[in-house]
Amino acid sequence: MSIYRIYAGADGESHIEEIHVAQHPELGALRQVAQVGIHEFPALRTMDFHPLPERRLIIHVRGEVEIGVSDGSTQIFRPGDARVMEDTSGRGHTHRDLTLQRHLYLP
């Protein structure tokens, strides 16, 4: 399992980095979750650059998705991977389903 952070940088671009929970104590707040959603999509989706309306944690349960950020980096997420989505401003990220997917969503 890998955890990645997608965020808007001071340069106005979105970036991706692999993170470790021990280095990000703020992720401990995720243990106090009040709401969890399950998203399952019946068709493959492709989305151009977009920011998210809120910070969220997404844990991949099934399928593969490629996320691109405006600095040109891309990352493929597989079952067990998690992403902390913090790109709530700026250009945001792209999204391309490689296979049908299901993921847990924690706002």
Regions found by a protein language model. Give the residues of each.
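Short acidic-glycine-tyrosine-enriched beta hairpin
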Residues: P42, S70-T88
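Short beta-strand segments in beta-sandwich/barrel cores
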Residues: T46-M47, G63-G68, A82
